[in-house]
């Protein structure tokens, strides 16, 4: 007798354990670990995932129930992915059921597309004779089919029904006589059509060749320590990736290449397809279920060897995974906003340990975590310090918006930006205007002196709430709203109010003879929205492209010679300890879009804080100086990567219960290790969503395990207090 360990398909902490069931004899030949099964659970029928098969019962067999069926339509989870799901559950704080669903980007089988083909088994002359005989006997359908096959010995079955008006019965009659053969094969849905592999290789320059050869040497020697490529914008990191991929493919390995969805453009993907042809596949959020299913089926069967996609591509079921590349590794999109709140970089490193694969990270602006790890010797560091080809660095200028206001300019466009736009457009060159509204939650800043109202305890900006009060979303500190700047006494203090539509409207008035495109969440809602706008801009169907951060992510437009960042402060003073890092990244990436061809590029950075180190160093293309200042701030405030960080989020439709439970958890964990620092509880940045209230508590510690211990303590408390368990939900976020 054998027994199955099953995780029930219910994401609840109390049910987050393995339940054992008897495997009926009839199921034994078919059942595998990773299958979805039907089970009796309590008084109902449920489904669950088999994570273990054993000979030993854990409870009395007389009390054990039997599996009732296998869900034939579900996808089987690879055993390695079950192991990874268990790591995700423990490391990021989720249920096993949530983690299992995460590692299954495709959860159900999708009907295959089948293609029938008819093959002529006799000679052309015999076919012509059979056709004449069929015509004499008035078998006109057979005659038409044989005449067609005499000219073309292999035809698609669809031709019979669409053009020749022949049914399957007629074809079957000829097949039974041994005249033709009907074959059927599965067609995979391919998201890239009509691609011809050129195999064209770009010769690497000296820097690129050194980096590629060094990483290849590491792989040859079995050195699988993660490698970080710090390469300035336009330095040709992709060429290095392609060289590494080719080396792995030639040795029988498979490759996952993660690219943030916002950068996953047709232009980017085609560079891989042109080099490697149809062994490449791509996934993204706008693909159909069928396309996603086929991509993963092709990976499992070995029909494709390279998978490109956002963080969900990490769970591609390759059999010989040898290399994981994470491009633009600094991107916040690699961190999931949903439970489990995993980070693709950390998860990739864990997956690589399980499979013996190499992880290669790349960025012009590495995340502080990755650079910190490189400095500590946990990652190998390689640098590309020069732009590939003839392109030089763009000239970046900082414009002080306080001076613009004093000089009577109350618009959102500085005089210098207007001057350069007129100059570039007159030369038929293109312009990109970037408005960073990501993370914008209503900080207050003075337009006269640039002062931003910040928390005296946490060094993050205070957020204005509907009641007019200013709140810190880290520690809960509150203060009344203000109308006059406490620094200079000016009345010009408030929230920055501008969106891409307003910018577009104003630019069209200022440049009526130039074509303008806008790229934001509204204009890219449809499946091919991104591609159409980018293709139009690349083909110079527009002179000016306005957009949010999606326009500055990895796109290469040789005719763009000016980039304007309209207000750098929006990201700089978002209520987040990573605000300066995000600002540095965005300005560097934005400025890097200019002058990528052979023409000189310019970038104009508009700000009320021209002296801030993140802006100054970004304009000077000086990552090292920025890192040194920012890591000193993190050390002073005990923020990651120096300390580990855990956010405990308490949610409930009952506002009183949310506040009450927050205080209970704070009191409970106050008794924890004295080395753990606790901040809060306070209201979440978005306090109420769909009638659910959110509060949060922050924990900081040098050791990740101590934070895990606090999580277990909170989980145990919740299990023992049903009055909270039924009305409140706890979510964890580790950094």
Question: Model-flagged regions — what are they?
Answer:
Residues 52-54, 104, 184-186, 435-437, ...:
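A general secondary-structure junction signal
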Residues 40-43, 261, 637-639, 686-688:
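AMP-binding (ANL) adenylation modules
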Residues 1-3, 16, 428, 600, ...:
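A general secondary-structure signal for short beta-strands and their flanking turns/coil
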Residues 199-205, 209, 213, 223-659, ...:
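Inter-lobe coupling/hinge segments of SF2-like helicase ATPases
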Residues 1-363, 375-391, 672-675, 698-700, ...:
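Accessory, non-ATPase domains that flank or precede helicase/AAA+ motor cores in DNA-metabolism machines
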Residues 667, 671-690:
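A carboxyl-terminal module marker
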């Amino acid at each position: 007798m054998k027994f199955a360990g099953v995780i029930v398909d219910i994401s609840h902490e109390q049910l987050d354990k393995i339940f054992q069931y008897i495997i009926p004899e009839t199921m034994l030949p078919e059942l595998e670990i990773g299958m979805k099964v039907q089970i009796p659970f309590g008084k109902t029928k449920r489904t669950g995932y088999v994570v273990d098969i054993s000979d030993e019962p854990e409870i009395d067999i007389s009390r054990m129930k039997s599996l009732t069926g296998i869900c034939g339509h579900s996808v089987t989870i690879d055993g390695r992915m079950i192991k990874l799901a268990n790591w995700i559950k423990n490391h990021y704080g989720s249920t096993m059921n949530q983690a299992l669903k995460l590692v299954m980007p495709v959860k159900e089988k999708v009907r295959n597309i089948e293609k029938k083909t008819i093959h002529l088994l006799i000679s052309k002359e015999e076919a012509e004779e059979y056709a004449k005989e069929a015509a004499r006997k008035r078998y006109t359908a057979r005659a038409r089919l044989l005449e067609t096959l005499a000219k073309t010995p292999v035809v698609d079955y669809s031709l019979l029904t669409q053009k020749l008006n022949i049914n399957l019965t007629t074809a079957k009659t000829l097949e039974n006589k041994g005249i033709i053969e009907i074959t059927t094969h599965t067609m995979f849905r391919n998201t890239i059509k009509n691609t011809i592999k050129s195999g064209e290789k770009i010769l690497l320059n000296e820097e690129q060749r050194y980096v590629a050869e060094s990483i290849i040497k590491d792989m040859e020697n079995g050195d699988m320590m993660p490698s970080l490529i710090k390469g300035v914008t336009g330095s040709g990191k992709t060429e290095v990736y392609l060289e590494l991929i080719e080396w792995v493919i030639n040795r029988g390995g498979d490759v996952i290449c993660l690219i943030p969805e916002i950068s996953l453009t047709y232009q980017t993907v085609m560079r891989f397809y042109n080099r490697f042809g149809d062994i490449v596949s791509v996934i993204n959020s706008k693909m159909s279920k069928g396309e996603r299913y086929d991509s993963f089926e092709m990976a499992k069967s070995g029909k494709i060897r390279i998978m490109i996609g956002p963080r969900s591509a990490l769970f591609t079921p390759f059999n010989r995974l040898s290399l994981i590349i994470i491009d633009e590794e600094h991107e916040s999109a690699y961190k999931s906003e949903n439970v489990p709140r995993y980070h693709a970089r950390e998860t990739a490193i864990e997956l690589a340990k399980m499979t013996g694969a190499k992880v290669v990270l790349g960025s012009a602006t590495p995340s502080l975590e990755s650079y910190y790890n490189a400095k500590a010797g946990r990652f190998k560091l390689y640098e590309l310090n020069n732009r590939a080809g003839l392109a030089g660095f763009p000239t970046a200028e900082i414009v002080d918006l306080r001076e613009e206001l004093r000089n009577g300019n109350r618009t959102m466009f500085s005089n210098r930006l207007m001057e350069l736009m007129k100059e570039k457009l007159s030369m038929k060159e293109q312009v990109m205007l970037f408005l960073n509204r990501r993370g914008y939650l209503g900080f207050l800043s003075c337009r006269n002196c640039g002062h931003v109202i910040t928390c005296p305890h946490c060094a993050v900006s205070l957020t204005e709430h509907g009641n007019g009060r200013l709140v810190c979303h880290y520690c809960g500190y509150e203060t009344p709203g203000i109308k006059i700047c406490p620094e200079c006494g000016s009345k010009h203090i408030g929230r920055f109010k501008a969106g891409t539509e307003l910018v577009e409207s104003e630019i069209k008035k200022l440049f009526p003879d130039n074509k303008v495109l806008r790229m934001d969440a509204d204009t890219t809602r449809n499946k091919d929205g991104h591609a159409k706008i980018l293709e139009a801009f690349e083909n110079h169907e527009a002179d000016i492209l306005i957009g949010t951060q999606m326009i500055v992510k990895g796109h290469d437009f040789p005719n763009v010679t000016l980039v304007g960042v309209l207000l750098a402060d929006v990201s700089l003073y978002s209520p987040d300890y990573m605000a300066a890092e995000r600002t540095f990244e965005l300005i560097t990436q934005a400025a890097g879009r200019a002058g990528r061809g052979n023409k000189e590029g310019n970038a104009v950075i508009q700000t009320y804080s021209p002296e801030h180190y993140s802006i100054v160093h970004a304009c000077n293309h000086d990552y090292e100086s920025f890192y040194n200042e920012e890591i000193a701030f993190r050390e002073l405030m005990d923020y990651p990567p120096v300390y580990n960080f855990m956010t405990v989020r308490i949610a409930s439709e009952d506002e009183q219960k949310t506040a009450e439970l927050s205080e209970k958890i704070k009191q409970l964990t106050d008794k924890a290790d004295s080395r753990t620092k606790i901040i809060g509880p306070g209201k979440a940045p978005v306090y109420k969503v769909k009638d659910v209230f959110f509060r949060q508590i922050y924990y900081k510690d040098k050791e990740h395990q101590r934070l895990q211990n606090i999580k277990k303590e909170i989980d145990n408390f919740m299990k023992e207090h049903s009055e909270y368990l039924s009305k409140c939900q706890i979510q964890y976020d580790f950094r």
